[in-house]
């Protein structure tokens, strides 16, 4: 029995180290530290975030520490200069652990607006007691608008919104699928009017509370991948880093 447990441990360790870099992970904030007003993007793209307002690293996160957002605070991603090749187009996933202070308002997990004024994405904790997952294509046409699941205040919940233009959309809360939507269209192609974590571009829907382990992908993850990332993080502790200094892939790659 001891030998078999040791062998299993070695197998899991080898899998962790051997995991290959996932080029579709474009943003990963593990919320373990703030570096002089900068939130480092652990996806290795070099596209870091800038703190605006009062955002603090606190204990009590789901996977280590977490980030607490005061009302009106946000992380600016400099959407106008986000590279086209890194902007999700044919697929997208947004995953995060969230713990909001109140359901007295809607809470924007992430928001971006295209240069043609399209409000292209809304992953939200809603004041009505549910969640929202929406994407739009060029010209402001809605691809899908999922409103489902049960939101509560002062409790950790995992949000997992995924989309693939070929197969459609799904919303997972705490790893369980609670809604789906159609595919068929590419996502609006740029973030020219801005991109933020925790506050809409027009200073609406402030996220107030704690957030942990936010990741954004330029493909639609599977339900199995969502569950793996929910439990282990987008980049598990101890995962390999390539020679170029970029982050190694998520555990999700092991599930393909």
Show where each model-derived region lies.
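Surface-exposed loop/edge segments in extracytoplasmic proteins
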Residues: 119, 141-146, 177-181
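Extracytoplasmic low-complexity segments
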Residues: 2-4, 9-72, 227-256
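Beta-strand-rich interaction surfaces with strong enrichment in secreted/lumenal proteins
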Residues: 82-84, 145-150, 183-185
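Extracellular glycan-recognition modules
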Residues: 22-26, 30-40, 45, 71-134, ...
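Short, solvent-exposed beta-strand-to-loop segments that form ligand-recognition rims
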Residues: 173-195
